[in-house]
Amino acid sequence: MEDFVRQCFNPMIVELAEKAMKEYGEDLKIETNKFAAICTHLEVCFMYSDFHFINEQGESIVVELDDPNALLKHRFEIIEGRDRTMAWTVVNSICNTTGAEKPKFLPDLYDYKENRFIEIGVTRREVHIYYLEKANKIKSENTHIHIFSFTGEEMATKADYTLDEESRARIKTRLFTIRQEMANRGLWDSFRQSERGEETIEERFEITGTMRRLADQSLPPNFSCLENFRAYVDGFEPNGCIEGKLSQMSKEVNAKIEPFLKTTPRPIKLPDGPPCFQRSKFLLMDALKLSIEDPSHEGEGIPLYDAIKCMRTFFGWKEPYIVKPHEKGINSNYLLSWKQVLAELQDIENEEKIPRTKNMKKTSQLKWALGENMAPEKVDFDNCRDISDLKQYDSDEPELRSLSSWIQNEFNKACELTDSIWIELDEIGEDVAPIEYIASMRRNYFTAEVSHCRATEYIMKGVYINTALLNASCAAMDDFQLIPMISKCRTKEGRRKTNLYGFIIKGRSHLRNDTDVVNFVSMEFSLTDPRFEPHKWEKYCVLEIGDMLLRSAIGQMSRPMFLYVRTNGTSKIKMKWGMEMRRCLLQSLQQIESMIEAESSVKEKDMTKEFFENKSETWPIGESPKGVEEGSIGKVCRTLLAKSVFNSLYASPQLEGFSAESRKLLLVVQALRDNLEPGTFDLGGLYEAIEECLINDPWVLLNASWFNSFLTHALR
């Protein structure tokens, strides 16, 4: 940077900047960005003043070449660049001559035409933020502020820009050139990020009148006036010991600090009860796809056309029958619903032209499955005021469920690799700055690790289903629309592939509020026999609908094909978040990036390449009863992604509560591991808050089990 400054700026400016830094005791060999900033600021001040004169009539004129005959006076007095003593002498002289108010801080220029001091700012941040900082520091209406940025923006007091447009354009062009030259040498990012805000001396902000009375009225209990409260807050040390904090609090706070030792924490108590059940909106590891490679059929890309084409690839259909009934439902209706789908798809195929969408006939079985006319009638509250025994209907407490092994299996499967590529991140232009090059490299490495991951398939499946369902809910509110569950991917050889998982039938969807529910029936293909883990499929009615021939190492074998049918519901807000499941990729990439940054700061160089290419190194993935599990960096990427995806698929109030409360206990345990001797009060209350979130959600129960494994190994 120092070499660049000496090449880029006039030697006189460089010399003045060196003097200024010496005066403030700063080393330009170390503070190279500051050196560049001072030179830039000096140059802008000089350019501001250049060629601007006042003629004999007192008018401001621009003269580019000196005319020896003209009696001209410089319009601007330059204060910036002089040593402090000389600068204050000039300021005092101007004030004595013109009667101007003496400024608190040294300004940069004095404008003889407008009779005002000018503060020039050059910022690498946003102009309005820098302007406010300057104004806050100067606190004077008599000093005019004019801010320039390296992006061509400017801001001035009362939008009075002092100079003509051409003069300002010269300054902006010069700043843009400096930025380009820095970027070409890889210096811009460091320079841009090094800017600090204006340092201001804090002053007491006095409140008077009505605002003062309101402030006195709105104090916490036990405070008589604002001054007392201020004194209390000022004396409240943010990093003081916890006992000191408690002693400052209200007398009603009665908390005894207990030391937190290795023997203090107990495991989180998981609930007893029947095993938990699958509650995701679509099947995960148990899903089966009917696929077509290199689709090129007529109407390719139209979901209904793609679905019919995929259905035609399977020849083992048979008369469906129920193998696992839903305990509370009318199972014959689920069976009739599937038969209706098959019949109506057959009707479509017999038509001359296949329609783009299909609305199902409103049969009794679909009306039942979609809860048509089942909602209680809504009555306006004003019409009920006179009813004496009006009360909210009683709702049962949810039944406690115990952790079941299937959810750990689901998670393990989500971390695995498939033989397909599920994401292709579009190119986003050529990298200009070094930081962009590093970001692209990290993104590409990460994409390579997760593009084949099953969790990524779940993302694309979730995005498609939620988008299709939300579209249909808005476009066909009264119809029972048939929505194919589709995803698209590429084979390892790069061939395109369209997959059909099953169908959704949407119920009536007059969704006014974000939380209004649309019911739907999902029908999904699977090779999983529900009789092996019936508790997992509590909410489903499962049919056997065909036999599938599978190729294996020992030849062909036939497996029964099942259809998992259930009634479900979702809302606008849930569909909106479902459509944005790609955010999970970003979240897990950022977590990986923080690991790379930590490694890079230790080694003092970017470690991205080594991080991803050193295949021999293992990293901690998580805790299990066996101890800390470790794996390759690819496995870490896929595990973090799977966690993020499951947080989206199994989002619930139970998860929100558990995450927030267990984090507090986690921080205390980490403080103990770091030998910080933590103390706690009401640890029992914290355990209570954590355990009240453990009700029946499989993902929350699994996280609690992992947390217990962590406690065991962390406190050995």
UniProtKB/Swiss-Prot annotation:
Complex and partners: Influenza RNA polymerase is composed of three subunits: PB1, PB2 and PA. Interacts (via C-terminus) with PB1 (via N-terminus).
Cofactor: Mn(2+)
Origin: domain of life: Viruses
Gene3D superfamilies for the chain: Influenza RNA-dependent RNA polymerase subunit PA, endonuclease domain
One Gene Ontology CC term in the entry: host cell nucleus
Family in the record: Belongs to the influenza viruses PA family.
Motif placement: Nuclear localization signal 2 (NLS2): 184-247
Keyword line: Cap snatching, Endonuclease, Eukaryotic host gene expression shutoff by virus, Eukaryotic host transcription shutoff by virus, Host cytoplasm, Host gene expression shutoff by virus, Host nucleus, Host-virus interaction, Hydrolase, Inhibition of host RNA polymerase II by virus, Manganese, Metal-binding, Nuclease, Phosphoprotein
Modification after translation: Phosphorylated on serines and threonines by host kinases, including human casein kinase II.
Protein's UniProt name: Polymerase acidic protein
Cellular compartment(s): Host cytoplasm; Host nucleus
Lineage: Viruses, Riboviria, Orthornavirae, Negarnaviricota, Polyploviricotina
